[in-house]
C-alpha cells in the first residue's frame, strides 16, 4: 500500500538562515571558506561543476581550478581521453558499462583516480554492486562519487559499498524535467537536511553533495548550512563567458551584429558590419574585436584563444553586449543523448535553453567567496566545519516570501 508523508517539505526558497546569538568573528577576512584540493594542493570552494558538456571542456578545465572550483570532465568526451585525464588526477564522469570496463582493464591504479559514476538513478542495485567491487579491488586509490538519490536511507547502502561522495537530488536541476516527467522528486532543502541527519545519526563517513536547484549564491550557502559537504552547480556555470556552451547573440545596433563563435577552445568575436553595396558573403565581412590590451581601441583579430583574453576585456564584452547568451542543456536531453550515442527511443529528461551570459568565472567565484565569508561571519563560523550542518534555519511565511521575491 502506498503511503503519504504529510510532513511539510521545503525548497531553498522556503528557508533562511538565522544568525548566531553572538559572533566573535570580527571580520570576513578572519574566516576560511575553502577546502583542500588533493589535485592542485590548493584551496577550493566546496563546489563541484556538474558534469555537463555545455559547462566543462578540456580548454577551460584548469580555469575552474584557478578560480577555486573543482571541475568534472563530462561523458561526451571520448573514453580514451577521459582515461588519459583520469590518470592525471582530474575528476572524470563515466557510465555503468564504462566503469565495468575500467574494473576489467586495470589491475591497479598508479595514483588516486577520481571517478564519478554518472547515471540518473542512483538507487539501482547494479550501481551499488559495481561500486562495492571497485572499492574492494582498488581501496583508497579510487575516490568514487555516485548518485543521484532522493531517499536518506540509501545513504547506508552507499556508505557500506565504500562510495566516498553521494549526489543528492532528483529533478531539481534547471535543465532537468525528471520531476514533471516522472513525479519523482523531494524538495531539496528538506532532502539535504534529512540526509545530513541520517548520516550523523548513523555515523556515516560519506560526503553529501547537494545537486540541483541552485539559482544564486544564497542557495549554495543554504545547502551547506543544511548539511551538504559540497554543492554541485550546473545551470549557473553554463552562463559564464568561459563555459563550454555556444555563445549566441542577437544584438543589433547601428547596422552591426555582434559576432561571437567558440569552437574547440578558440573564440572569434567582434562586430560583423553589414556593407549594403557589397555581397553579404561571410568572406567579405569585416571582423573586429576589442583589443586585449586596451578596451578603448578596436583592432582586427580573428581566432583569439580564450585564455589570452584579459578579465577586463571579458567583463567589457558582457557589459557592452547585454543580449549575449549561452546555450546549455541537461545531460539527459536529446542533444546530450545524441553526443553520448544513446540508443533511439529513450525518453529525454532534460531540456535545452538559452541563459544570459552575465559573469566571468572569476567574477562569480569571487562573489561566491565573499558571500560565503559574510554568511559564516553572521553565524560565528571560523571555518566550514563550524558552518556545515550546524545552523538554525527558519521557514518563511508566505507573506514574507512574496515580500522577499517582489
Language-model regions, residue ranges each:
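Alpha/beta catalytic cores of nucleotide-metabolism and tRNA/nucleoside-modifying enzymes
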Residues: 1-23, 183-210, 214-406
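Active-site entrance/lid segments in N-terminal catalytic domains of soluble metabolic enzymes
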Residues: 1-207, 235-240, 293
Amino acid at each position: 500500500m502506498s503511503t503519504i508523508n504529510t510532513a511539510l517539505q521545503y525548497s531553498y526558497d522556503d528557508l533562511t538562515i538565522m544568525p548566531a546569538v553572538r559572533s566573535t568573528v570580527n571580520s570576513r577576512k578572519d574566516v576560511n571558506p575553502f577546502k583542500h584540493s588533493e589535485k592542485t594542493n590548493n584551496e577550493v570552494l566546496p563546489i563541484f561543476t556538474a558534469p555537463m558538456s555545455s559547462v566543462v571542456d578540456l580548454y577551460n578545465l584548469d580555469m575552474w581550478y584557478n578560480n577555486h572550483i573543482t571541475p568534472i570532465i563530462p561523458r561526451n568526451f571520448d573514453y580514451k581521453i577521459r582515461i588519459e585525464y583520469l590518470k592525471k588526477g582530474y575528476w572524470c564522469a563515466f557510465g555503468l558499462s564504462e566503469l565495468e570496463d575500467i574494473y576489467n582493464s586495470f589491475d591497479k591504479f598508479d595514483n588516486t583516480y577520481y571517478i564519478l559514476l554518472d547515471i540518473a538513478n542512483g538507487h539501482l542495485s547494479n550501481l551499488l554492486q559495481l561500486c562495492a567491487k571497485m572499492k574492494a579491488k582498488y581501496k583508497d586509490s579510487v575516490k568514487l562519487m555516485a548518485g543521484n538519490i532522493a531517499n536518506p536511507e540509501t545513504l547506508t547502502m552507499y556508505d557500506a559499498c565504500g562510495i566516498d561522495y553521494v549526489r543528492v537530488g532528483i529533478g531539481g536541476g534547471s535543465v532537468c524535467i525528471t520531476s514533471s516527467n516522472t513525479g519523482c522528486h523531494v524538495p531539496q532543502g528538506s532532502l539535504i537536511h534529512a540526509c545530513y541527519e541520517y548520516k550523523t545519526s548513523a555515523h556515516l563517513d560519506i560526503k553529501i553533495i547537494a545537486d540541483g536547484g541552485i539559482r544564486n549564491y544564497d542557495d549554495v550557502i543554504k545547502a551547506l548550512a543544511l548539511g551538504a559537504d559540497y554543492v554541485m552547480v550546473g545551470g549557473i556555470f553554463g552562463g559564464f563567458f568561459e563555459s563550454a556552451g555556444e555563445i549566441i547573440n542577437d544584438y543589433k545596433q547601428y547596422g552591426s551584429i555582434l559576432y561571437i563563435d567558440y569552437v574547440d577552445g578558440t573564440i572569434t568575436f567582434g562586430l560583423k558590419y553589414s556593407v549594403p553595396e557589397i555581397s553579404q558573403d561571410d568572406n567579405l565581412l569585416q571582423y573586429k574585436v576589442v583589443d586585449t590590451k586596451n578596451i578603448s581601441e578596436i583592432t582586427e583579430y580573428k581566432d583569439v584563444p580564450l585564455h589570452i583574453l584579459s578579465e577586463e576585456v571579458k567583463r567589457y564584452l558582457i557589459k557592452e553586449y547585454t543580449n549575449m547568451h549561452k546555450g546549455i542543456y541537461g545531460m539527459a536531453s536529446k542533444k546530450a543523448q545524441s553526443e553520448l550515442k544513446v540508443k533511439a527511443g529513450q525518453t529525454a529528461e532534460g531540456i535545452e535553453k538559452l541563459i544570459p551570459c552575465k559573469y566571468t568565472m572569476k567574477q562569480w567565484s569571487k562573489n561566491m567567496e565573499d558571500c560565503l565569508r559574510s554568511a559564516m561571519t553572521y553565524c560565528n563560523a571560523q571555518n566550514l566545519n563550524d558552518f556545515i550542518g550546524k545552523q538554525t534555519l527558519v521557514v518563511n511565511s508566505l507573506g514574507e516570501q512574496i515580500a522577499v521575491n517582489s
